[in-house]
């Protein structure tokens, strides 16, 4: 589907936890949206120049609705948190490649769906899209959980918290070790230290892993080269081994990127 910019409508919005907001948007972009893709949301304040890329959390194609769950991290997302039902907003999408769910062909395959922090929301649509043995392993800072009940509809949820207030004390890798879990495939989204640990684990255990890289983006369409990552492959034309996260990703096979 070609990316396009359109006016959409806020269907609902609620605060899930301090600084974490849950918004449903009515838009035709839902027609072909995939797990792991993102949209760009445009602030209305003229002083806030750039759109904000936000991962797609959930899709309801029959209602032409997209769900985004985001953290207020600056002026743009702070503005988004004030939007009310019925308000019009400008969005562009759908952007990025998404998770390769077609890699899972057997319902007996055990798959780790791993999310950390604001990397948890895209795991929801991914869990909905897969028909297999799903272990949903998510990491939070503390007991301020979000999307737990939503995720539990689609697989076994294992929780890790940094302070040990819920589930395993530590991170998602600590939860795997504590539970003695094994997988045939890994999909993950979260902060870079978490993704590095997953990449190392997957390579050591010889498990295929696909990771969604979080990165600040400016244009969202590959023009500005502000969100590149190093890859093993060298481009035949430029002779550099960089990929644009916004267009070549944000999902990459873990063994193909240097992080």
Where are these regions (language model features)?
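Structural signal for conserved beta-strand scaffold positions within catalytic alpha/beta enzyme cores
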Residues: 12, 58, 159-161, 211, ...
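Ferredoxin-reductase
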Residues: 2-85
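FNR/FR-type flavoprotein reductase catalytic core
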Residues: 77-216
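Short metal-binding segments enriched for Cys and/or His
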Residues: 256
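Local cysteine-cluster metal-coordination motifs and their immediate loop/turn environment
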Residues: 122, 215-250
